Amino acid sequence: MEDLDPPREQPGARQLILEQLSAHGLKSDLPVTYQSERIANYHSALDALRQQSLVYPCDCPRKRLPRHYPGFCRSRSESDPTLETYALRYRIQRDQITHADAHLGQRSWKMGKSLGDFIVRRRDQLIAYQLAVVYDDIEQGVTEVVRGSDLIDSTPYQLELYQAFHHTPPTFWHFPVVLGSNGVKLSKQTGAQSVDVSTPADNLKRALRFLGQSSPDSKETSKILKSAVTAWQPAQVPKLMGRSL
């Protein structure tokens, strides 16, 4: 459970997510792990990056920066005495990162254009998303990451971290996200409605059709999921970043 940002976390959100998944027959095979309970692990990971001189302090105001960090603070030493009051950025080691996504094919990101040094510890001392998810996946032995295409641009940053931790990266597989009538991804930030847990079977069938899959004539979530696994055809999933329902 990604709960590393207390200022933005809504009360009851963690339990609601688990209840929504459970209503659709989706339950974890193992006890749920919460990132908020793994802070010490992430600081160990951060120390490993420090030992390799792969991070540096940065106090650049986020609102004034272009989308991809241009490296204003790159020459700062990790031993700078102001280190604990600034954010920490990871120093990317490659001018270009190329990766073959298992579904969308080869993608490339170039330093300065679609790539820049990224935050691994925020100014408020909170651990950043990229570092936490990579370290989680390494410690949990994750070999395949299947996620929405809105996260595909996180891939080069995560590949850099896997390299820094001397670990083979997982296979990445990105599927299209659901877009609203305005062409924007449905999300809580855009005011999208929450999942209706009173119609789980219909929701699952709709999701399968969205992904180009067949859906069985059943009202039981267990049967729908079992059929979906058996009949899964990854080649039928649209090779798109997003599409409307």
Where are these regions (language model features)?
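N-terminal Rossmann-like or analogous alpha/beta NTP/dinucleotide-binding catalytic cores
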Residues: 1-70, 150, 154-167, 222-223
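Short alpha-helical "patches" and their helix-cap loops
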Residues: 1-10, 174-176, 217-227, 244
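Short alpha-helical interface elements
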Residues: 14, 24, 42-46, 156-159, ...
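Active-site cores that bind ATP or allylic diphosphates and position pyrophosphate for catalysis
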Residues: 57-197, 215, 245
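Non-catalytic terminal extensions that flank enzyme cores
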Residues: 93-95, 184-245
